[in-house]
């Protein structure tokens, strides 16, 4: 997990890694995960060019669209669907197969999950949409607090080991 201050350098490193993996140079390296906590706070994504995207946004877009095939995965948390759509181009949701939502407006729920269920949820509940969209499978669960740094480090260590 990285914060907004380290975003630019990390995204540059991952874009370079993606290019190496696409060319076959780094194909055997282990999977890489980039956790973006609060994409709405990434100022570098706000000042868009004439096409509606910053240079950092273009690189993140490429990682989101092509990275999973080459073992580079994004975990993105955003406070609103609109903030996520500002950070990336329209259609970015197609790059995210697994989605989690707390209570949302009916429109955002339909756009994110393909169902209005998240608009009718109680507090302290969340929905998880699986990558198998055809099945329509959605799981309801109780989210809890973000784990402390020690727990996150243990999880990251396990992920690195494979």
Segments the model singles out, each with a brief description of its role:
Residues 105, 109-162:
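Conserved P-loop NTPase
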Residues 1-112, 119-121, 150, 160-161:
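P-loop NTPase catalytic phosphate-binding loop
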């Amino acid at each position: 997990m990285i914060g907004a201050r380290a975003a630019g350098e990390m995204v540059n490193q991952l874009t370079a890694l993606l290019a190496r993996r696409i060319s076959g140079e780094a194909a055997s390296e282990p999977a890489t995960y980039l956790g973006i906590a609060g994409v709405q706070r990434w100022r570098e994504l706000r000042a868009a060019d004439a096409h509606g995207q910053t240079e950092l946004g273009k690189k993140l877009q490429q990682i989101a669209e092509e990275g999973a095939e080459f073992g580079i995965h994004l975990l993105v948390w955003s406070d609103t669907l609109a903030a996520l759509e500002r950070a990336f181009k329209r259609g970015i949701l197609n790059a995210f197969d697994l989605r989690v939502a707390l209570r949302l407006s009916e429109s955002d729920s339909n756009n994110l999950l393909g169902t209005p269920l998240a608009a009718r949820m109680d507090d302290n509940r969340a929905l998880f949409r699986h990558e198998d969209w055809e099945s329509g499978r959605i799981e309801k669960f109780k989210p809890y607090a973000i784990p402390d740094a020690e727990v996150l480090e243990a999880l990251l260590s396990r992920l690195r080991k494979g």
